[in-house]
């Protein structure tokens, strides 16, 4: 075979990176992008440009291409599809050889897939809709420190969703008053309480004060109720060294679970903390603060299903997923899709839920889906139906806003949850019969009755901004 010769100049991307005849390998990492090209840029060229800029390409031919096997290492745009109901954009499917990515590094994956390519002038908007991580790559990642079953065994809680609460006000409480709020919620019937995502170590409450008062509250509530209790102690910090210092102290005082803001804190920090939690027997709750900056626009950014997959690889035992019924953005079908991607071992392609590829997680443990944001007792039937048992239902204002106080709010939520779980186990349609189920339970629980009266008119009926494209058909 004649040796390839270097020929300087600029070629159209499609000449190298548009390969419609390519059949993806089981070891390829596959990505689906939604591309809105600039006027005058055709689909094949735009798709090839994204494949090039997210893998081996640059704007001109370079002689060093001849020093490696470009045909092996390049990304390949292999399929284009219409976006239902939108003529401006299209789906581009791109295959990347696994050797483009460092083993076990979600940071390296994102640096390629959502790096400079998102500022590329040939596209007006670009969104990463889904990624298929090959099982060969999944096996290089640590994943959740413990997973669903191990957490249930550690906390001795089975057969129902867990109940939680974010302490409010989220900022401004002293350590002692914060601990008191935690105690009231836990003794009332909750399994967990939680630091809000922006509680770190501010002047009004330094982290060590909070940790000490919270653990005092946990021990007291456990002694009174005979149940295991926990509080998500947020160890997110300005530096990794400080983060580990806080995590070590939490372990020292007996905390069963800590918390990290995985997007603002960074994927490197999150993976390191997940490894530490695995080695030290501490559960890890993950908050998704900043996700909507990346995932809310329907044409530009990163879809949350990708952020959820990245978190499962990076490591976390819980992840906030939205509620569908609460105050935060969330399409029902899409939410059900990424809940499955967090918990199941194998998730097949399902366009009705926005899942573009089969995803095999092998033996990687699952992640608890956390429903939080503007929910109260009236939402309980829908939440139990949507999220199932392997979830944490967190009622912040829906606990602390009870007219009789935190303990009464917690008690109301526990009674509502157990009534819905019992009805479901009896074969009833919990979502359809929710009002009847809750009303019957409230006859024996004045706390639930008052909660139902307090929040009977509270609804969040704004339309979802980021709808599934299938819904536009």
Swiss-Prot record:
Site label Transition state stabilizer, positions: 327
Signal peptide: none
InterPro entries cross-referenced by the UniProt entry: RuBisCO, RuBisCo_large_chain_AS, RuBisCO_lsu_C, RuBisCO_lsu_C_sf, RuBisCO_lsu_fd_N, RuBisCO_lsu_N_sf, RuBisCO_lsuI
Catalytic activity: 2 (2R)-3-phosphoglycerate + 2 H(+) = D-ribulose 1,5-bisphosphate + CO2 + H2O; D-ribulose 1,5-bisphosphate + O2 = 2-phosphoglycolate + (2R)-3-phosphoglycerate + 2 H(+)
Pfam families per UniProt: RuBisCO_large, RuBisCO_large_N
Cofactor note: Binds 1 Mg(2+) ion per subunit.
Cofactor(s) required, per the database record: Mg(2+)
Positions of substrate binding: 116, 166, 170, 288, 320, 372
Keyword annotations from UniProtKB, A to Z: Calvin cycle, Carbon dioxide fixation, Lyase, Magnesium, Metal-binding, Monooxygenase, Oxidoreductase
GO terms (BP aspect): reductive pentose-phosphate cycle
Residues binding Mg(2+), per UniProt: 194, 196-197
GO molecular function, one term: magnesium ion binding
Residue list for modification N6-carboxylysine: 194
Record carries keyword Oxidoreductase: yes
Enzyme Commission number(s) of this protein: 4.1.1.39
Family as reported in the entry's similarity comment: Belongs to the RuBisCO large chain family. Type I subfamily.
Function, as annotated: RuBisCO catalyzes two reactions: the carboxylation of D-ribulose 1,5-bisphosphate, the primary event in carbon dioxide fixation, as well as the oxidative fragmentation of the pentose substrate. Both reactions occur simultaneously and in competition at the same active site.
Descriptive protein name: Ribulose bisphosphate carboxylase large chain
């Amino acid at each position: 075979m004649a040796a390839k010769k270097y020929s300087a100049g600029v070629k159209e991307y499609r000449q190298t990176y548009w390969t419609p005849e390519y059949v993806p390998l089981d070891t390829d990492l596959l990505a689906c992008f939604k591309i809105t090209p600039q006027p005058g840029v055709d689909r094949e060229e735009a798709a090839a440009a994204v494949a090039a800029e997210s893998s081996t390409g640059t704007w001109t031919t370079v002689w060093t291409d001849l020093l490696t096997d470009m045909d092996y290492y390049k990304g390949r745009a292999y399929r284009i599809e219409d976006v239902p109901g939108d003529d401006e954009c299209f789906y581009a499917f791109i295959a990347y050889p696994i050797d483009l990515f460092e083993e076990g590094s979600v940071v390296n994956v994102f640096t390629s897939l959502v790096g400079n390519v998102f500022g590329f002038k040939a596209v007006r908007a670009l969104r990463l809709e889904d990624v298929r991580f090959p099982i060969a790559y999944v096996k290089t990642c640590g994943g959740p420190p413990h997973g669903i079953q191990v957490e249930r065994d550690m906390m001795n809680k089975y057969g129902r969703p867990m109940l939680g609460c974010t302490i409010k006000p989220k900022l401004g409480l002293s350590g002692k008053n914060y601990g008191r709020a935690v105690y009231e919620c836990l003794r009332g019937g909750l399994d967990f309480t939680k630091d809000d995502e922006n509680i770190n170590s501010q002047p009004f409450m330094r982290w060590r004060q909070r940790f000490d008062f919270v653990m005092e509250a946990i021990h007291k509530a456990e002694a009174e109720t005979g149940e295991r209790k926990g509080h998500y102690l947020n160890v997110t910090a300005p530096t990794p060294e400080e983060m580990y210092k806080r995590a070590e102290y939490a372990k020292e005082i007996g905390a069963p679970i800590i918390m990290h803001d995985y997007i603002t804190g960074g994927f490197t920090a999150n993976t390191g903390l997940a490894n530490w939690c695995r080695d030290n027997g501490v559960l890890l709750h993950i908050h998704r603060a900043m996700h909507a900056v990346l995932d809310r626009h329907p044409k530009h950014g990163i879809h949350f299903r990708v952020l959820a997959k990245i978190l499962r690889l990076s490591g976390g035992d819980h992840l906030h997923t939205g509620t569908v019924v609460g105050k935060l953005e969330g399409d029902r079908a899409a939410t059900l899709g990424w809940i499955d991607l967090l918990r199941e071992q194998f998730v097949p392609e399902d366009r009705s839920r926005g899942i573009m590829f089969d995803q095999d997680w092998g033996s990687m443990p699952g992640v608890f889906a956390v429903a939080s944001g503007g929910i109260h007792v009236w939402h309980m039937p829908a939440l139990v139906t949507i999220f199932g048992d392997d979830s944490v239902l967190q009622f912040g204002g829906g606990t602390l806003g009870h007219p009789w106080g935190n303990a009464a709010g917690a008690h109301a939520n526990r009674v509502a949850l157990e009534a819905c779980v019992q009805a479901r186990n009896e074969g009833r349609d919990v979502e359809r019969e929710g009002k009847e189920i809750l009303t019957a339970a409230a006859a024996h629980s004045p706390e639930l009755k008052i909660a139902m009266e307090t929040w009977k008119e509270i609804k969040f009926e704004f339309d979802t901004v980021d709808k599934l494209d299938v819904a536009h058909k």
